[in-house]
Amino acid sequence: MKRLLLSLALAGGLAACAPSLDAPPPSACLVGAPYLTAQLFFGRSVAGRVPVSDAAWQAFVDGVMTPNFPDGFTVLDAQGQWRNPQTAEIAREPTKLVIIGVPRDAPLRARIDTVTSTYKQRFAQQSVGIVVADACAAF
C-alpha cells in the first residue's frame, strides 16, 4: 500500500512539472540561452515512383540542409501518417525527422522556407511538416 501511495504521489508531482499548452513561453532560461527549435518532417514516398533513396536524401542534406544550418542538426528515421487535404485519404510513409536548434535571434524562417521548398520541388512532395517552438539550450 505504501508503494502505491508513493507511486501516486510521484506521478502527481511529475504531472505538475508538465508545461501548460496555454502558458506563455518562459522569459528566462534556467539553463543555457533562449533558442528556437524546429522540427521538419520530410516524407520519403513519391507518388507513382520509387521512394526518396538514402543517396538522394544524403545529397539533399549535403547540398541544402548543411549550407542552411551549418551549426548542426539531428536527423531521425520515423514513420509518418497524415490525411491528404484534397482526397481525405490517410497516407503512411517513411519519414526523416530533422531537429534544428538556433539562437532565438537567428533568422530561421527564410532558411526553413529554402529547405522545405527545395525538398518539395526536388522530390515532388505536396508538403513538409514544420513545428517551431521556444526552448532553452546549452551546448
Annotate each PLM feature:
Residues 1-4:
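Positively charged n-region of N-terminal signal peptides that target proteins for export
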Residues 13-16:
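C-terminal motif of bacterial Sec signal peptides marking the signal peptidase cleavage site
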Residues 24-25:
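A compositional/biophysical signature of low hydrophobicity enriched in polar/charged and small residues
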Residues 31-54:
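Terminal, regulation- and interaction-focused segments at domain boundaries
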Residues 50-54, 58, 105-112:
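Solvent-exposed, acidic/flexible segments
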Residues 56-95, 100-104:
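Mature extracytoplasmic domains of secretory-pathway proteins
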Residues 87-139:
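Helix-rich interaction surfaces within compact, conserved domain-sized segments
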